[in-house]
């Protein structure tokens, strides 16, 4: 098992303490073994669906799915993949809102394992620390790369940034299309879901909250 960074451990422990961690159980299975076993099971599933895996279009599909699950769309289940975080001292004494708009994200609904496609806007008020801007995007992506519900994902990003910045003054809003609604069930192709998580001054101060929410495109 890969050793975890200090940032990864801090964020994971903060989420566990708040009951916000994605339901997971460590099984001690290596990445490569996971791929092998997922490939075996996926081969069985596709065969049960009457697909001919000897066809040259399908023969590598179980392998591709296994690799995709472990290395890509579910890579956020492994905190060894938590992004390297750069946090610096706020020597400039910056005290105005920092906002990153329209962070694109693709996640997976944990109920049906189909796509969630959306964007997030993240803001914070610098106190003692400033975080590298690209790190905000990477944190959003990390939590998107696992089976999710949007409400929890929004809270996870909030708590992760609060933990790394040492400040409660963080805000997130997320708008996403859920393909479990769009491509099955009710088959609603136009609706989207918006979730918001506010901390510190964004929750306490109506003016700060309004500045954040009114600036969202």
Swiss-Prot record:
Keyword list, A-Z: GTP-binding, Hydrolase, Metal-binding, Nucleotide-binding, One-carbon metabolism, Zinc
Gene Ontology CC terms: cytoplasm
Keyword Cell inner membrane belongs to the record: no
Gene3D superfamilies tied to this protein: 1.10.286.10, 3.30.1130.10
GO biological process, one term: tetrahydrofolate biosynthetic process
Subunit structure: Toroid-shaped homodecamer, composed of two pentamers of five dimers.
Family recorded in the similarity comment: Belongs to the GTP cyclohydrolase I family.
Official protein name in the record: GTP cyclohydrolase 1
């Amino acid at each position: 098992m890969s050793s975890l960074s200090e940032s990864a451990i801090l964020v994971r422990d903060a989420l566990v303490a708040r009951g916000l961690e994605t339901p997971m159980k460590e099984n001690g299975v290596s990445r490569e073994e996971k791929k092998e076993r997922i490939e075996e099971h996926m081969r069985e599933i596709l065969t049960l669906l009457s697909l001919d895996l000897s066809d040259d279009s399908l023969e590598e599909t179980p392998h591709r799915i296994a690799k995709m699950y472990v290395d890509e769309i579910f890579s956020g289940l492994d905190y060894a993949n938590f992004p390297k975080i750069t946090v610096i001292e706020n020597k400039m004494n910056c005290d105005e809102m920092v906002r990153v708009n329209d962070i694109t994200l693709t996640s997976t609904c944990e109920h049906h394992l189909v796509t969630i496609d959306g964007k997030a806007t993240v803001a914070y008020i610098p106190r003692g620390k400033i975080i590298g801007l690209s790190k905000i995007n990477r944190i959003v992506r990390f939590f998107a790369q696992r089976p999710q519900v949007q409400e929890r994902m929004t809270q996870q990003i909030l708590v992760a940034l609060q933990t790394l910045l040492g400040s409660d003054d963080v805000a997130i809003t997320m708008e996403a299309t859920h393909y479990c609604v769009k491509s099955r069930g009710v088959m609603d192709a136009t609706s989207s879901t918006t979730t918001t998580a506010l901390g510190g001054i964004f929750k306490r101060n109506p003016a700060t909250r309004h500045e954040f929410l009114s600036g969202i495109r």
